[in-house]
Amino acid sequence: MQIEKTAELNLLWGSLILEELARLEVQHVCMAPGSRSTPLTLAAAKQTKLKQHLHFDERGLGFLALGLAKASRAPVAIITTSGTAVANLYPAIVEAWLTQVPLIVLSGDRPPELLGCGANQAIVQPAIFADYAKQVNLPTPDMAIPPQALLTLLDESVANAKGPIHVNCMYREPLYPGSMSADFTHYLSPLGNWQHSALPYNQFADAQLVSAPTSDALARFVHGKGVIIAGTLAPEQQPEQLIELAQKLGWPLLTDAQSQLRQHGAAIGNIDQLLLQPKAKALLQEADTVLVFGGRLLSKRLISYLSEQKWKRYWQVLPQQTRLDPSHSAKQVWISPLAAFAQLPWPRSSEANWALQLIEANEQLATLFQQQIDDAEFGEAQVVRTIAGRGEQQLFIGNSLPVRLYDMYAPITPIAPRVFTNRGASGIDGLLATACGIAAHKASSTTLVIGDLSQLHDLNSLALAAKQQGTLVIVILNNDGGNIFNLLPVPDEKLRSGYYRLAHGLEFGYGAAMFGLPYNRVEDIVSFNEAYDDALAYPGASVIEVCVAQDQASEQIARLAAWIKQS
């Protein structure tokens, strides 16, 4: 009877954990199969408040959870068994920590007596994620530990989470309960009204510090030639407020690819390429004041401009306290929601409209890109611009070359997509799985633009794509290797080819077929547009493989840069 009660108590603790997470605003739980996590899996299977997502590969599962958390703006739970299953989550946890996305890992574990003695599938799991996750270690379930102790520990750990949390859950066998004959009424009685409410046992107010300058400080700050820079911003931060702020101050708004404003007609979205133009760069160098929202800028030219300019006044606005400035500039950092800071009583700048010429220069580049990309030879930049110009949808842009092409050449459009990236650690792993999570939250129409090596990294996440209920278009830019290295100063072409680009000669048609996904291979823009139209109308995931020459993108980038420098 006592052995049977162990299994039932394991399940009870699992049920308490999943119920409390649901009350702490968790909407999704991602699970991989495994025995040691059975108490958590069985509890999740019975939990009607959480949407379940299952996948056989823990590495992809972690990135799926990352995408769900990005799209839902809420914590996402992940359940894994013991051993290397937990370790496979590491890349996603690193990305989540760097970008402050809340993931809650619930890892099943062996009890203490089975660690370090040769027991099967047993590794030291506490602190496996080092500094990249907050660590919570639960003992094996025990009637001597009151349930309210478990709930308060979860509440304090998860409430207002700004990054990953690892809850390690030790369980003794048996793991599979039988008749559920144990009566836990007395054990649960201290929980009182919690059993009949929908609120967490402990409710923690958000202790977020909010800071704002005085009216006098605002007046002093805007006295000069200023620029506003929009870094990485989420759609929910209301980045469009920066358009109004820029117009009020009379300062140019320079926008990063991840700002949600890269394609806005009132912003200077072509800033990366404008910094190649001598006249535009000289004008920007007249600025003495900068107001930065967010961080993690993509463009090296914009990063260099920000770090090399001699600023008299430098303010950065962040939603929470962190360091997002690799140049380590002297500045005032304000902790504030973007919208609240933009809506302060800003006076008009004494140097309003000092950089109006940038608007014309930005529009001239837009015309150049239309002529030399849209109306020129088929290539990667042409495909990226075509996708970005399709209006309202979710757009996940892969790392390496795709996101840089978007940053350099995205079109100015009246309606732009919601842009997502994984630019914390900027890895090329897990990109398809992340896009699947973003698409799955509300089954919203989503396009992923991904390079061929990135897709090879995450090939088995096509199984996740096959489960999509909404439109997910997977556009693979296949230039046969890591051809971003064509843009880097590798000293020898033989070294570049043999040690960096790693041409593979592979195509993705059979991979798509293996997972039952519709597939099109295209080599011209007419075929791409036809395939893309069909894919956007399809209620599920589909694959479009864009086949281009290895040097097409790098040669076009160099050619455009040469023209811009001479203009």
Swiss-Prot record:
Top-level EC class: transferase
Entry-linked InterPro entries: DHS-like_NAD/FAD-binding_dom (IPR029035), MenaQ_synth_MenD (IPR004433), MenD_middle (IPR032264), THDP-binding (IPR029061), Thiamin_PyroP_enz_TPP-bd_dom (IPR012001), TPP_enzyme_TPP-bd (IPR011766)
Disulfide bond annotation, renumbered to this chain: none
Assigned EC number: 2.2.1.9
Molecular function per GO: 2-succinyl-5-enolpyruvyl-6-hydroxy-3-cyclohexene-1-carboxylic-acid synthase activity; magnesium ion binding; manganese ion binding; thiamine pyrophosphate binding
Keyword Metal-binding: yes
Stored Gene3D superfamilies: 3.40.50.970, TPP-binding domain
Swiss-Prot/TrEMBL keywords: Magnesium, Manganese, Menaquinone biosynthesis, Metal-binding, Thiamine pyrophosphate, Transferase
Pfam families, sorted: TPP_enzyme_C, TPP_enzyme_M_2, TPP_enzyme_N
Pathway: Quinol/quinone metabolism; 1,4-dihydroxy-2-naphthoate biosynthesis; 1,4-dihydroxy-2-naphthoate from chorismate: step 2/7; Quinol/quinone metabolism; menaquinone biosynthesis
Cofactor: binding details: Binds 1 thiamine pyrophosphate per subunit.
The UniProt record lists the keyword Manganese: yes
Cofactor(s) this protein cannot do without: Mg(2+); Mn(2+); thiamine diphosphate
GO biological process, one term: menaquinone biosynthetic process
Catalysis: reaction(s): isochorismate + 2-oxoglutarate + H(+) = 5-enolpyruvoyl-6-hydroxy-2-succinyl-cyclohex-3-ene-1-carboxylate + CO2
Description of how the protein assembles with itself and partners: Homodimer.
HAMAP family reported in the protein's UniProt record: MenD
NCBIfam families documented for this protein: menD (TIGR00173)
Protein function: Catalyzes the thiamine diphosphate-dependent decarboxylation of 2-oxoglutarate and the subsequent addition of the resulting succinic semialdehyde-thiamine pyrophosphate anion to isochorismate to yield 2-succinyl-5-enolpyruvyl-6-hydroxy-3-cyclohexene-1-carboxylate (SEPHCHC).
Family: Belongs to the TPP enzyme family. MenD subfamily.
Protein name as catalogued: 2-succinyl-5-enolpyruvyl-6-hydroxy-3-cyclohexene-1-carboxylate synthase
Organism: Shewanella loihica (strain ATCC BAA-1088 / PV-4)
Lineage of origin: Bacteria, Pseudomonadati, Pseudomonadota, Gammaproteobacteria, Alteromonadales
